[in-house]
């Protein structure tokens, strides 16, 4: 839990720095980099103990930030909203291996979420592996992740 708090503090600090650095606040690429880095750090924190866990956090944050920045650079607010809603729907209701697609008619960007294996983690939470694919400006990017249901049901 202490590690998660440190990650969130770092993410918040990076967010404030990015917002101050960009005219008009945080841009799409900065948001993608920040969210990707925080998500990667959180995912990396699930592996190893002690120094091994710190390595996992560092590697996860770096890879997440790079991928998030690339994706975020081309996604607008509507793209992000469509992707988020589709992810929630796919993870809640779609059978494993099926694609649930979103498409932004205003710019032609699209993507899909493919839920995979459902399992219970060591804390007893129900989790699901998934693949998220986005096509922004004709370029495809893929990301892999795990989502776990929280105690409040979300």
From Swiss-Prot:
<dbReference type="InterPro" id="IPR032635">
    <property type="entry name" value="Anti_2"/>
</dbReference>
<protein>
    <recommendedName>
        <fullName>17 kDa surface antigen</fullName>
    </recommendedName>
</protein>
<dbReference type="InterPro" id="IPR016364">
    <property type="entry name" value="Surface_antigen_Rickettsia"/>
</dbReference>
<dbReference type="Pfam" id="PF05433">
    <property type="entry name" value="Rick_17kDa_Anti"/>
</dbReference>
<keyword id="KW-0998">Cell outer membrane</keyword>
<dbReference type="GO" id="GO:0009279">
    <property type="term" value="C:cell outer membrane"/>
</dbReference>
<keyword id="KW-0449">Lipoprotein</keyword>
<feature type="signal peptide">
    <location>
        <begin position="1"/>
        <end position="19"/>
    </location>
</feature>
<keyword id="KW-0564">Palmitate</keyword>
<dbReference type="Pfam" id="PF16998">
    <property type="entry name" value="17kDa_Anti_2"/>
</dbReference>
<keyword id="KW-0472">Membrane</keyword>
<feature type="lipid moiety-binding region" description="S-diacylglycerol cysteine">
    <location>
        <position position="20"/>
    </location>
</feature>
<dbReference type="InterPro" id="IPR008816">
    <property type="entry name" value="Gly_zipper_2TM_dom"/>
</dbReference>
<feature type="lipid moiety-binding region" description="N-palmitoyl cysteine">
    <location>
        <position position="20"/>
    </location>
</feature>
<keyword id="KW-0732">Signal</keyword>
<comment type="similarity">
    <text>Belongs to the rickettsiale 17 kDa surface antigen family.</text>
</comment>
């Amino acid at each position: 839990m202490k590690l998660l708090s440190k990650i969130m503090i770092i993410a918040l600090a990076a967010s404030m720095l990015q917002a101050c650095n960009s005219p008009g606040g945080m841009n799409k690429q900065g948001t993608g980099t920040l969210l990707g880095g925080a998500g990667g750090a959180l995912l990396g924190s699930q592996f190893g103990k002690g120094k091994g866990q710190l390595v996992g956090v560092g590697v996860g944050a770096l890879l997440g930030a790079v991928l998030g920045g690339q994706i975020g650079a081309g996604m607008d607010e509507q793209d992000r909203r469509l992707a988020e809603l589709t992810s929630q729907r796919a993870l809640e209701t779609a059978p494993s291996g099926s694609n649930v697609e979103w498409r932004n008619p205003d710019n032609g960007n699209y993507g899909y979420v493919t839920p995979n294996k459902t399992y219970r983690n060591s804390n007893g939470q129900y989790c699901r592996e998934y693949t998220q694919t986005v096509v922004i400006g004709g370029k495809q990017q893929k990301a892999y992740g795990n989502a776990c249901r929280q105690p409040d049901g979300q």
